[in-house]
């Protein structure tokens, strides 16, 4: 599962230490399983929409000096959605985008990801690590191969993509528009 994968990444590439910074902390469920802490929380916690005490509002530039952070976890939204279905009152539609957030267009997603990558490159130490949790997505019937784009873009910003982990989904949320 994702928790085991993250623990493996931390052990392999961060000497078993916790992340120093998470800019997509939300309420910290990522660090828990069934209400039990299984991954140590980061020292610095940020989110676009802080929901709990101890989480700071994400603004750019981040309040860190250049080359000052050892490790970053980034688990951004991946859903591209807009329109009436976001506010139609149906609790079974747009589950992910309602729980976290979404981008209105593919361009918005790419701009956001690019902005974050550049800022992380600025604040990460030379031997620091960025864990960018992402997945491909579909919008308006078009596939967007996000992990491949992130690797390409990170490389062009100056990162060295050291590793890639893939978690295979056992199930998928399917749009209500799809008839099976």
How does the language model describe each region?
Residues 1-180:
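Class I S-adenosyl-L-methionine-dependent methyltransferase catalytic core
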